[in-house]
From Swiss-Prot:
Name of the protein this chain belongs to: Neutral alpha-glucosidase AB
Family: Belongs to the glycosyl hydrolase 31 family.
Biased composition regions of type Basic and acidic residues, renumbered to the chain: 198-211
The organism's taxonomic lineage, starting at the top: Eukaryota, Amoebozoa, Evosea, Eumycetozoa, Dictyostelia
Subcellular location: Endoplasmic reticulum; Golgi apparatus
Superkingdom to which the source organism belongs: Eukaryota
One cellular-component annotation, GO: endoplasmic reticulum
Keywords: Endoplasmic reticulum, Glycoprotein, Glycosidase, Golgi apparatus, Hydrolase, Signal
Active site per database record: D540, E543, D617
Glycosylated position list: N878, N887, N907
A single GO BP: N-glycan processing
Region (Disordered) location: 186-231
Annotated function: Cleaves sequentially the 2 innermost alpha-1,3-linked glucose residues from N-linked oligosaccharides on newly synthesized glycoproteins.
Extent of the signal sequence: 1-23
Amino acid sequence: MRKLVILIILSIVCSLFIGSIESVDTSKFKTCKDSHFCKRNRVSHEVGVMNEMKSKQNFNIVEGSIKLVKQENTIYFDLQEQNQKSNLLTMKLEIYEGGIVRMRAQEKEPLLNKQRYQVQDVLLDTIKTVPIQWKQEPSKQSNTFSFKHGEKECCYVLVQLVPFKLDVYIMNELAITTNSDNLFHFEPISDKPQPLPPKEKKSEEENKEANQEEDNNNNNNDNNEEQQVSTEGYWEERFGSHQDSKPNGPMSIGMDFTFVGSSHVYGIPEHTTRLSLKSTTGNGINEQPYRLYNLDVFEYEIDKTMALYGHVPLMISHDTKKTVGVFWLNAAETFVDIEDVTTPVSPSKKTHWISESGIIDVFYLTGPTPSTIFKQYAYLTGTTALPQMFSLGYHQCKWNYKSEDDVKQVDNGFDENHIPYDVIWLDIEHTDGKRYFTWDNNNFPTPADMQNIIGAKHRKMVTIVDPHIKRDNNYYVHSEATSKGYYIKNKDGNDYDGWCWPGSSSYLDFTNPEIRKWWATQFGYDKYKGSTPNLYIWNDMNEPSVFNGPEVSMHKDAKHHGGFEHRDVHNLYGYYYHMASADGLVQRNADQNDRPFVLSRAFYAGSQRIGAIWTGDNSAQWSHLEISNPMLLSMNLAGITFSGADVGGFFGNPDAELLTRWYQAGAFQPFFRGHAHLDSRRREPWLFNEPYTTIIREAIVKRYSYLPLWYTTFYQNTLNGAPVMRPLWVQYPKEANLFDVDDHYLIGDSLLVKPVTQQSCKTMKVLLPGQSVNEIWYDVDTEKPINAGVIEIDTPLEKIPVYQRGGSIISKKERVRRSTYQMRDDPYTIRIALDSSKSAQGQLYIDDEHSFDYKKGKFLYRQFTFKDNVLSFSDASNKSSTSYKPNVTIEKIVILGVQKPHSITCNITGKEKLSFEYDSTLSKLTIRKPDLLVDTDFIIKLN
């Protein structure tokens, strides 16, 4: 009977997700007006209390509290809310290497039994403060003081005492102001008030006076509204049928930041709006603020500020003079308002950040260029983990491949249709009743053999492992987790019990490092029976998703390690789960020398150090194909570079044209995976017949040919944090016409891509940037040179608009193979596109494509330079190993935009004279079979 009840409940829950795929049910998810902490903080046009809030929220620096502790490179002072005698805050100001300013604020003397959560494990251990110098010392005669970097001129900070305000100056120009609108808000930790004792019976006269007072209050609508905003939801809060007990009461924080001189801000992924973030308030705009709260949104809508699966609280501002940023280090639910402000002097972007709990911990990234912003953010949170080469190939996924025979047929289908691919994926149905680390023995009786058959072709398999653990005492993971007390607790201290795919489920507390270590051991070959070294992992549902929880997630009053509530750590949960899973893949091998591959849906700042991310449950609609580019660009700006969107759309059934265009777009996005819902029809690349099979094959083959570029660009990210997929303005920061462009993008600094994302598109306009520097672009298909500017092109179905920048040198591998492994020893083709000065340069990175040996110097990082008709090839890094000598050659060199030489000579013995072909129509020179080793320096002269 109990099993029947469970099945009925599961069918109802699943129908909510599987049956309704037209659009997301927004009633299940909160907006600012549903979150009392947001209403209390927000300068709301709905309530109209802006002036009242401003007058109440002034914070002042306490006189005599300012001190510079040189041993700590830190300035301390106390803050006190105006007209308040208690609830002192303490603030710390620091400058870090690279010109990063940090501001932290919390209670000076919090209650002994309560504490605020401070984000752990996101910042790198290597970050260091630098000495601070007074620029203007504090004094009784002045309402301001200022300080600067003690070792170099990059920026300085001006602090106003009454009311508190902090301004960041870059190159002596005001860049970011803090609390200029007096929206600094800090709800002090307090104990819940005890109910008042029963009142004695009042006299008739006292009752009359009380009634008259109540009438007077009711007549004052403004006061009633303000009181409602100020006090509602302090100690409990309801949403739908769910109650949040809020045992710690109100603990929200807020702050405003204005980006001076800016009209464009970017970042704070993940949302479905355009790359340049839209205003949510001011000038008659009535939008919900951007929400940052990781949620399982089973089908999302376009152009919405609602929360999705992962978030990074980083905002970047860019104008023609500077690029700056704010990183708000807080893991609780957060809202961000954006407002355009235009003054006679310059535009500005005002932003208001509100979090439910935690401390104020803000990093000011002072830039002042795009490249320095990326370096500064990477300095704090790290760069992208260098992926294995196979993970940059094509991945084939479906919910679900039904059996070992089904897997075999799909695998053979790629070979029969001559389409390369690297990874086949298994969704939740491969398990024994959604018990992860197990197999459905009826359909997958010999999983190790299945993986070995795939592995014999040098391909990989990925299985899904979600964080919800089926509550079954016969399931070893659950029984051990229960006995060790490893589950998150509910508000009453019992193991949290929620519903997900397995039915009744509990959730491990990954904020506890002991539990993360234990989880990592579950991936050992002795624990994960049937797994092999060819098996990698997919983490889904890790926001976390709880079907019967508030907003399809966990109750905020659930209890975590250290006594913190789930509300404090929510946005870190998926990050920690992703981390523990990746650690498990490393530790399962004795030598611990295999780079992990773990795809995650949830993410936070620092997730780039762990593995790949995808944009979640999109739909087979043209609008979802179109928005995938802005979404991925936003993620790349925030460090999440190894990211992609499900090709074809997860929900629904794309027609042949949409699927083809999506493959073409996905081939030029960092993570390239086809995926589909359980109820979607099969859509393997060959199922739509001709001409679609051929065109899709060509798109995938083109992806594989550019893998040396992708791999090199990912390596360069490990050096400088630069996005792999980047907006045009990153490369051309002074061209204001590019600041809104998000349907074109660059791969590294070399390829410009504008995917076709409109149905029945026959022609389209392409914006080729760089007019101010006389940039030249080359169509990669026709090889014709095109001057920078707007052009109109034909877009037949087989056309992918891709252009190589003049001045770049790209390495390719053009032999078609089954998978990336077979390409390892293939020779390179070098494509040189000359700029208007007849020069070009580029890099090539090579290692063993799978291990951590590159960290020991076992790699080649090579530099190509073409100038004055001379091509030189040399080491681009003094860290390359002199002993690492891959037996790989260069078999062809193509130079575009060059005059025909009389002869070509090389300084390598036996290669002194090289043969060539010349196409005068294209000004194209081809050197065939130079057969030069990639580990050897050489010089080629065009005479």
